Amino acid sequence: MADTTGRIPLWLIGTVTGIPVIGSIGIFFYGSYSGLGSSL
């Protein structure tokens, strides 16, 4: 775990790519339930 110099940690990649994906899915389902997603 100490040899992370020069490389991006896997948990950092998962966090940076996971939050926008979960957020967009949450916004999509929230919009569809509130009636905004039906126009997409």
Swiss-Prot record:
Keyword Ribosomal protein: no
Transmembrane segments: 8-28
Gene3D superfamilies listed in its UniProt record: 6.10.250.2070
Annotated keywords: Chloroplast, Membrane, Photosynthesis, Photosystem II, Plastid, Reaction center, Thylakoid, Transmembrane, Transmembrane helix
GO BP terms: photosynthesis
Its job: One of the components of the core complex of photosystem II (PSII). PSII is a light-driven water:plastoquinone oxidoreductase that uses light energy to abstract electrons from H(2)O, generating O(2) and a proton gradient subsequently used for ATP formation. It consists of a core antenna complex that captures photons, and an electron transfer chain that converts photonic excitation into a charge separation.
Name of the protein in question: Photosystem II reaction center protein J
Organism expressing this protein natively: Chloranthus spicatus (Chulantree)
